[in-house]
UniProtKB/Swiss-Prot annotation:
Native species: Caenorhabditis elegans
Entry protein name: TM2 domain-containing protein ZK858.5
Keywords for the protein's UniProt record, in alphabetical order: Membrane, Transmembrane, Transmembrane helix
Transmembrane segments: 10-30, 37-57, 104-124, 127-147, 168-190, 209-229
PANTHER family assigned: DNAJ HOMOLOG SUBFAMILY C MEMBER 22 (PTHR44733:SF1)
Family: Belongs to the TM2 family.
Length: 409
């Protein structure tokens, strides 16, 4: 071999683990590229994997050094009979429940991230659409394929893709399951089918594979962040004070001011004003439309006009869980202002959480006003008082009672 590999020092791996362990730098140094990407895309598997490797990294180093010291003939364990290799035995891989669990969870993770990007950024809410099913199935396939490459093994990409698409199609179009259940069950089926093609890996991945996978993942994250900025941060909040004036600000500006200048947020919600929500206007005049039509493709790309055109559907599409997230953020901020004013003594997070629960409990619009929600609570309380029966063990009723009493304080 022209490029002979040398043994690695444990202290070097420890330093790399401390500095860049959350992003999989130590795994990349040990040429465990798929494992490094999993660390990178999950921040060290939410710190748990990073903590585990901080204690067990010596075993990984010893295993790597043993592979380096092995002769060329012993790099792959092959079964021979009468001078011929038995291919079926050389490809045999033992079943591992741990790997199976990792594959299902990571495939579901990437699949959910793909679904989130399509929903938040591009406004795809109908999961029954074939293109939507294809994109989500592709995300699940990518996650299962990456896990299948870990530990010196590999999986056939075509097997995983066919199983993922067909399972997703059946779950969504025929079984009519929810998105989360469909993604999870599809990940299970795809992992089982993919394991049928499991074999020992015969080539090593390089940093180019890591760079390519990381670029795709970062692009996915950027798409999600851009969508969240349009659906959440760009949402306009109007505070109306009777007999005074109306003031409008975006949710993103409120979050920024809460971090850097909390007094602005408190002054905005001072006096418990009437809160209204509305989307940022995207209406353009005719001259703007003509400019968009006459401008070149690259000008539209660099100016952001093309992105606005592609994500226009998401900007107009109403998604309940995103609206609930927006109202929860605003509720926490205005509840903090009420505590500072002395008009409330309830913990802001608790008050906002109960308010969101009541919206979900009564199936109301996420952007409902406080007056309307108070009316619904009083109406529900009146109806419950007129009913006879033992409700001490009905947790739905008990939760609604607690939520209404907390909100009406």
């Amino acid at each position: 071999m022209n490029n002979e590999e040398t043994e690695v020092k444990p202290w070097i791996v420890r330093i790399i683990l401390i500095v860049g362990g959350l992003f999989g730098a130590h795994r990349l140094y040990l040429k465990q590229v798929p494992e490094a990407f999993v660390f990178f895309s999950t921040l060290g598997v939410l710190l748990i994997g990073w903590l585990y490797d901080s204690f067990m990294f010596k075993y990984e180093v010893n295993e790597y050094n043993q592979l380096i010291n092995q002769s060329e003939n012993n790099k792959e364990k092959e079964k021979w009979k009468n001078g011929k290799m038995q291919a079926s035995q050389s490809k045999f891989v033992d079943f591992s429940f741990t790997r199976f669990l990792y594959s299902v969870l990571y495939g579901s993770y990437i699949g959910l991230a793909t679904w989130l990007a399509c929903t938040v950024t591009f406004g795809w809410t109908d999961i029954n659409l074939i293109p939507f099913i294809c994109v989500v199935a592709l995300g699940i396939t990518a996650g299962i394929y990456i896990i299948g490459q870990c530990g010196g093994q590999s999986r056939e990409l075509s097997y995983i893709w066919m199983a993922s698409f067909s399972s997703m199609f059946i779950m969504v179009r025929l079984a009519q399951t929810t998105v989360f259940r469909a993604i999870f069950l599809t990940a299970i089926v795809s992992t089982v089918i993919g394991n049928r093609s499991a074999r020992l890996k015969k080539r090593r991945h390089t940093w180019k594979h890591f760079l390519f996978w990381s670029s795709l993942f970062l692009m996915l994250v950027c798409v999600i962040l851009l969508g969240c900025s349009r659906k959440v941060a760009d949402k306009q909040v109007t505070a109306t004070r009777p007999g005074t004036f109306r003031e409008t600000i975006s949710v993103g500006s409120l979050i920024r001011d809460r971090i850097f200048d909390a007094k602005k947020v408190h002054s905005f919600f001072e006096g418990n004003p009437i809160i209204e929500y509305h989307s940022k206007s995207d209406i353009k005049n005719k001259n703007g439309e003509k400019t968009l039509k006459n401008s070149s493709f690259w000008y539209q790309v660099w100016s952001g006009e093309l992105f606005d055109e592609l994500t226009g559907a998401a900007h107009l599409t109403k998604i309940d869980w995103i609206e609930l997230t927006t109202t929860f953020i605003v509720d926490v901020l205005r509840s903090e202002a009420r505590v500072i004013d002395g008009s409330s003594t309830i913990e802001p997070f608790k008050w906002a959480l109960w308010r969101n629960y009541l919206i979900h409990r009564f199936s109301l619009d996420p952007l409902i006003s406080d007056d309307r929600l108070r009316t619904e609570c009083k109406k529900w309380q009146t109806e419950e008082k007129s009913k006879k029966g033992n409700v001490d063990r009905d947790y739905n009723i008990l939760a609604a009672k607690q939520g209404c009493s907390t909100f009406l304080l």
